Structure formats: structure tokens, C-alpha cells
Amino acid sequence: MAKIIRIKGEILGKDEPMVFTKEYNVVKEDDALETMYSEMGSKHAVKRAYIKIVEVSEISEEDVQNPILKKTLEMY
């Protein structure tokens, strides 16, 4: 069964830390982390060592803030 995972963190190594929140609909928490590392690393050109995870939590469909993920969940 799929879970909705919210990852909060920051990217270090730049002039000032960039704070982010990402939400993923995945089967395992590890899948969400791997996708987040891949996306953030390619978009911001940082290595995984510079991405600091602050919080990883499972959330309900009502708590989703990402509009694209919200629309996707409404379809099913």
C-alpha cells in the first residue's frame, strides 16, 4: 500500500542554507528519500552530503500541500 511521505530539510554549502519541503507518494520511505536526493542534487547541483534531512514523516491525504500530488490523489 502506498504512503505519502513528507521530507523537510535544507541544502548546505551555499551562501545560506536553502530550506525545502517535498512530498512523495511511495511504497517505502527509502524510495522517497532516494527520489528527493536525486531531484535536489540535479536541480541545485549539490552532492548528497550537503543535503541535510530535518524530518521525515508519513502524512494523510488531507495534509498534502503539493497541488500536483493532491490532484493525483484525487484521481484515485
Curated annotation (Swiss-Prot):
What is the designated name of this protein? Answer: Large ribosomal subunit protein eL20
- An example Gene Ontology CC term for this record: ribosome
Q: Which family does it belong to?
A: Belongs to the eukaryotic ribosomal protein eL20 family.
* Subunit description: Part of the 50S ribosomal subunit. Binds 23S rRNA.
Any single GO molecular-function term of the entry would be:
large ribosomal subunit rRNA binding
UniProt xrefs under NCBIfam families: PRK00773.1-1
One short Pfam name that applies is: Ribosomal_L18A
Keywords associated with the record = Ribonucleoprotein, Ribosomal protein, RNA-binding, rRNA-binding
Q: Which InterPro entries match?
A: Ribosomal_eL20, Ribosomal_eL20_dom
Matching SUPFAM superfamilies = RplX-like
Tell me the GO BP annotations in alphabetical order.
translation
